[in-house]
A protein has these predicted regions:
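Terminal low-complexity/charged segments
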Residues: 1-210, 367, 371-373, 387, ...
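Metal/cofactor-centered catalytic core regions of large enzymes
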Residues: 42-45, 112, 138-571
């Protein structure tokens, strides 16, 4: 891609890096003026990532592997760093991994945020992060063959059926609370579960000593599906289905990645329409989570009222695109449908109604003593832990970090729409609730401005050519935090590689630190403050570290106890 060097960001950071590590950078390739990929010597990979992360205000929302043996004879690992200091840009650190040894030095001991990504690279590609502290599988099940790695370009024999796993558990749940408690798991399936997943709380009486969890029991294989079965624009509609609430955010991130790779100029009106729908999605998600927060503290009147107002955000989506879910609008290069004057006026009317409704509900919420009593000082995310693990969204902003991609790396029309960045310093559940409250009002103001100031341009750029093996990042500040996608185009009208990273993926690793020192009855509220997919936590094992006993209970029972605080499930 031709990039005007005079407007390139990150040059000062790269110059400092080259001075600090002479000869470390082997290659440098610009994707956009704000994005650059550097290939570094593999033995210096941890040093380079650590230097950018801590010395230049970098954050690590995503890392991934790629099988590039047909391109250069190697595997590759990519660490995408969002640089959020004085010079804001994206620096992607790439290292080539020998195809025979498959070893690369783990970054996790230097930057803990890399832990889940490196575990996934090992599972999906068979690469070996030497020095990785957590050697457990992340994605693959225990009975998956050791020599089969799904995202390699090798031919897969889909007829293979592995031998059944034994009744004995092979996955070690970790308790860092200095206890030799024995764990007796049952499951992970349970009749009350919406979806498989296993969540463990290690407790001493009612107090949580530690927590561990295993997810990925139902892995949809969307990245492999995109690479093998779908054309470029078909993946746009697949990305819509990544999440049931913020699917539009994923489709914007995906299309943005391809547009950045090809240098496509998206019409301004399409940018504005994308921003409008992204804020409608934020309203939907935040109002849902605020309602659930009411439910978890036993304030079900607030729960029902917030869900009543949330319905208006779905009516808004139906007005704008014909569906209560924001599906099917994006294409590479723009959008498929316009917002007409009548729809715009009706939406503005709904915005005014929602502002009045939400103001009344928030006043009622903050006047409810139980809300502050149950949320202040609970589930604290320590600033040091937050800095080390790169969580995202309201979770990180509730711990005092001013991080939001709409401000740090404006995309769509966010460079033109007035907006406010809200942070709270408490680090607790209450702070995260308040971030969502403030952002709800700001989304309404942004919608009003965007609907009143829609540019008169086309909706779609057409006539561009796809370039094999061009690649770039695309990103969105979804309601839960950063959705970051990376796409490399192929030479057969399909993607060579698609990395799709959702916000909750970045937030899971810090949850165990937020649960420690709190009580069992606070667990649903703390977990809910992340705004994760609840089906991931529908099964809980409680392990009493004093009595060395474990008890498996439905998540709904923990939720019930968190609301009424009677009849402890531990007894």
């Amino acid at each position: 891609m031709n990039v005007n060097s005079s407007s390139n960001r990150g040059e000062a950071i790269l110059a400092a890096l080259k001075t600090q590590f002479p000869g470390a950078v082997l290659d440098e390739e610009r994707q956009t003026p704000e994005q650059v990929t550097i290939t570094v010597k593999i033995n210096l990979l941890p040093d380079v990532v650590q230097y950018l992360y801590y010395q230049h205000d970098g954050w690590l929302p995503v890392l991934f592997g790629n099988d590039e043996r047909t391109l250069n004879g190697h595997y590759a690992v990519y660490y995408a760093l969002s640089m959020e200091g004085a010079e804001k840009c994206w620096i992607v650190v790439k290292a080539l991994v020998d195809a025979d040894s498959r070893e690369f030095p783990s970054v996790t001991p230097r930057v803990p945020a890399a832990v889940w990504g490196e575990r996934e690279i090992r599972d999906m590609y068979g690469l070996i992060p030497v020095g990785l502290p957590d050697q457990r599988r992340l994605v693959l099940p225990d009975d998956w063959p050791e020599d089969m790695h799904p995202l390699r370009k090798d031919a897969m024999d889909y007829r293979l059926r592995p031998e059944p796993t034994t009744d004995s558990e092979t996955y070690p749940f970790i308790n860092e609370g200095n206890s030799d408690a024995r764990v007796i798991p049952v499951g992970p399936l349970h009749i009350t579960s919406d979806e498989s997943g296993h969540f463990r709380l290690f407790v001493d009486g009612e107090q949580i000593v530690d927590a561990d969890y295993r997810l990925f029991y139902v892995h949809r294989g969307m990245e492999k599906l995109a690479e093998t079965r779908m054309g470029y624009n078909e993946v746009t509609f697949l990305s819509d289905r990544v999440c049931g609430i913020c699917g539009f955010a994923h489709s914007v991130a995906y299309t943005n990645s391809v547009e950045n790779a090809l240098g496509i100029e998206v019409p301004q009106r399409a940018h504005t329409i994308r921003s409008i729908l992204l804020e409608v999605e934020r309203l939907h998600s935040h109002l849902l989570n605020l309602g659930l927060s009411c439910h978890f503290v036993g304030f079900d009147t607030g729960f029902m009222q917030f869900f009543r107002v949330r319905e208006k955000s779905m009516t808004m989506a139906e007005l704008l695109i014909g569906s209560r879910k924001t599906y099917g609008l994006n294409l590479i290069g723009g959008v498929r449908r316009d917002i007409l004057k009548e729809q715009r006026l009706q939406t503005l009317k709904l915005v005014r109604e929602m502002r009045a409704d939400v103001s009344e509900l928030v006043e009622m919420l903050l006047a409810t003593p139980n809300m502050e009593q149950r949320t202040q000082g609970i589930g604290i995310l320590d600033r040091q832990i937050a800095r080390e693990y790169s969580p995202v969204g309201p979770l990180i902003r509730g711990s005092g970090f001013a991080r939001d991609l709409r401000f740090d790396h404006p995309y769509a029309d966010y460079g033109n729409i007035p907006k406010t960045l809200f942070t709270f310093t408490g680090g607790d559940v209450f702070s995260r609730v308040m971030v969502r409250v403030k952002e709800t009002f700001d989304s309404l103001a942004m919608l009003e401005f965007a609907l009143d100031n829609m540019p008169d341009t086309p909706l779609l750029t057409e006539g561009f050519s796809y370039k094999p093996h061009a690649f770039a990042l695309g990103f969105v500040e979804a309601p839960r935090g950063e959705d970051v996608h990376w796409s490399m185009l192929g030479d057969n009208q399909k993607l060579f590689r698609w990395r799709c990273s959702a916000a909750t993926y970045a937030n899971w690793p810090v949850l165990r630190y937020m649960l420690r020192g709190n009580t069992v009855s606070d667990a649903p509220l703390i977990i809910g403050s992340l705004d994760p997919c609840y089906s991931c936590t529908d099964r809980v094992t409680l392990v009493d570290v004093r009595k060395r006993q474990s008890k498996t209970v439905p998540y709904k029972e923990i939720e019930r106890y968190g609301i009424d605080r009677n009849r402890s499930p531990l007894k």
